[in-house]
Design a protein with these regions (language model features):
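RNA-contacting regions in translation and RNA-metabolism proteins
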Residues: 1-41, 51-53, 58-82
Length: 82
């Protein structure tokens, strides 16, 4: 499931090298934390949240096959100063 999220998000964003997905396992729930650059957050969320909702729908369908519950959270990275 982690690979699925990375594959989809890297295809959408301008900075695919900055996409990072962390998996936190619970008893029956898996939480995925998605980190992208601040410039890419809008692209991942999409107009009226349609893009992130579509990704979450795919994630939930995949998790349901394994009798699990999955959640996807977007964590914004801080701007890196040079």
């Amino acid at each position: 499931m982690k690979d699925l999220i990375e594959y989809i998000v890297k295809a959408i964003v301008d900075f695919p090298e900055n996409v990072n997905v962390t998996q936190i396992d619970g008893e029956s729930t898996i939480v995925f934390e998605l980190r992208v650059r601040q410039e890419d957050v809008g692209k991942v969320i999409g107009k009226k949240g349609r893009t992130i909702n579509a990704i979450r729908t795919l994630l939930n369908a995949t998790a349901a096959k394994a009798n699990l519950r999955a959640m996807l959270e977007i964590v914004e990275e801080e701007e890196q100063s040079s």
